[in-house]
C-alpha cells in the first residue's frame, strides 16, 4: 500500500467531480485513501443512468491515484474498528446496498486513526465539530480549504463552488423526484 496522505469522504469526491477538479485534488493530496464504505457509496453512481454517472466514471479513470482502504488492511485492529463503528450504531458496515448516513465519515475517521493517516477530508460540518476534539491527532479538512489549495485564485475558487452548489441542487431535485415516485408507488400498492 502506498503512503496515504489523507482519507477522503464521498462528498469531497463528489464536489471535486462536480467542478472538474478531481485530478487537481488527487495530485495535491497524492496518495488519497477511500474507505471501502466510501468506495461503495461512489460505485453506486455507476448504476445511475443520468448525468451524474460521471462521478463514478471519473473515479474509475483515476484509480491509479488512490487506494481503497479495506477493513482487512487493519489486521489485528479490524475488531477494534468494527467495535468503534458499532458504538456509533453501525451494524452493517458494507454500505453497498443502501446509503447509511454518516457511515462513510466514521469509517474514514477510524481508518485514519488506526492507519495513522493524519488528514481526513469531509464536508459534514456537524461530524467535524463532534469528532475533532475526540481525535486531536487527525486534522479534518473541509472542501473550502481543499478548494483554496487547488484553485488558481479566489475567482477560480468561487467559480468552482458556484458550480458545485448548482450541481448539488440538481442532485437534490433528482433525489426528491425519486423519493416522490417511490412514495406514490407504495401508496398505490
Which stretches of residues belong to each language-model region?
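Active-site-proximal, substrate-binding regions of enzyme catalytic domains
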Residues: 2-115, 128-189
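Short, ordered loop/turn segments at secondary-structure junctions
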Residues: 125
Amino acid at each position: 500500500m502506498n503512503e496515504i496522505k489523507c482519507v477522503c469522504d464521498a462528498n469531497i469526491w463528489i464536489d471535486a467531480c462536480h467542478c472538474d477538479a478531481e485530478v487537481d485534488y488527487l495530485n495535491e493530496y497524492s496518495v488519497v485513501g477511500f474507505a471501502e464504505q466510501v468506495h461503495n457509496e461512489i460505485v453506486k453512481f455507476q448504476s445511475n443512468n443520468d448525468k451524474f454517472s460521471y462521478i463514478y466514471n471519473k473515479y474509475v479513470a483515476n484509480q491509479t491515484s488512490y487506494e481503497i482502504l479495506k477493513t482487512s488492511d487493519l489486521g489485528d485492529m479490524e475488531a477494534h474498528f468494527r467495535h468503534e463503528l458499532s458504538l456509533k450504531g453501525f451494524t452493517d458496515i458494507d454500505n453497498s446496498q443502501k446509503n447509511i448516513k454518516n457511515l462513510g465519515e466514521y469509517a474514514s475517521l477510524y481508518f485514519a486513526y488506526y492507519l495513522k493517516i493524519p488528514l481526513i477530508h469531509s464536508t459534514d460540518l456537524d461530524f467535524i465539530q463532534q469528532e475533532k476534539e475526540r481525535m486531536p491527532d487527525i486534522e479534518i479538512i473541509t472542501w473550502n480549504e481543499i478548494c483554496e489549495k487547488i484553485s488558481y485564485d479566489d475567482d477560480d475558487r468561487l467559480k468552482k463552488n458556484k458550480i458545485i452548489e448548482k450541481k448539488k441542487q440538481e442532485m437534490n431535485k433528482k433525489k426528491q423526484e425519486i423519493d416522490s415516485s417511490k412514495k406514490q408507488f407504495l401508496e398505490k400498492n
